[in-house]
Amino acid sequence: MTAVSRTSAGIASVLALAMSFPAVAQDREFGGEIELVDPNVLRVCADPNNMPFSNQAEQGMEQAIAELLADKLDRESVSYSYFPQATGFVRMTLGSNLCDVIISYPQGDELVQNTNAYYRTSYALVYPKDGALAGVTTIADPKLKDKRIGIVAGTPPATYLARAGLIGRAKPYQLMIDTRVDNSAKSMIDDLGTGDIDAAVLWGPMAGYYAKLADADYTVVPLVAEGPGPALAYRITMGVRASDQEWKRTLNRAIRDYQGEINEILLAYGVPLLDEADEPILSQSGKTAQDLPLPQKAQAADVTAPADATDTAASPEPKG
């Protein structure tokens, strides 16, 4: 790939950028709207500091996938419009024509038009490997009784902790955070390392990534056997504008044709991939996500955020 350019998601640049890029105008199959997708540059909407998904140093898995797509779709380069993934993220990026695709978006969210899903994962339980909790696969396991479990407040697994009688001793971590100044996932894994908590429940991609970054050895167990209750497994798509029908079809073809390569990227970042039967998807070498080494650029990522932000953002966990 050629050099990657960066675009900040500032309001002042919206009109200038919208007027400056060479757009492809394509009639919609229904209605008179046109598509404004840059034919030369893959323009990606991203969070500036939210590993393992993305950061401004372009070390995230979304950015690795973007580079793959740009290469396969013959784009000259990749550019990023950065904005914290919170209320206003879609409006300030994709909706303002600053970028043409959100690489990771939960299936079914009506703020964007979804492509076909390109991976499926779940919330996961993390605990020390070969420790007292070895073999635990569900929140209801008696081994977790009287244990202190870290949980992101307001996420679906909290229902299962309450059902198992574990919520009273649980340590809550914030869901609504500014990803540029706080990191609930890293804090939780750090607390697991110090013994402040005995286990952690996190969104799968975060669980896998931060467990890999940690000095200690951890087991990451996708929560797929919890019984009736809120969904814990979700399909993840790419998000595009409602008017961009041909662009969606282009991305769907790319997902179909390069699914294997996309899987390898996700697994390398620690994402516990699941098929539709909740069975783990392995790498081409037969390894699990936790057995694969992190990409070198991901190992070097600074996951501590600079204290210079004011907006409130949320971890990109699916809403269930």
Language-model features: where?
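Extended ligand-binding regions for polar small-molecule ligands
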Residues: 26-27, 35, 60-73, 130-133, ...
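Periplasmic-binding protein-like
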Residues: 47-48, 120-132, 212-255, 272-296
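Acidic, polar ligand-binding/catalytic clefts
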Residues: 67, 71, 79-143, 154, ...
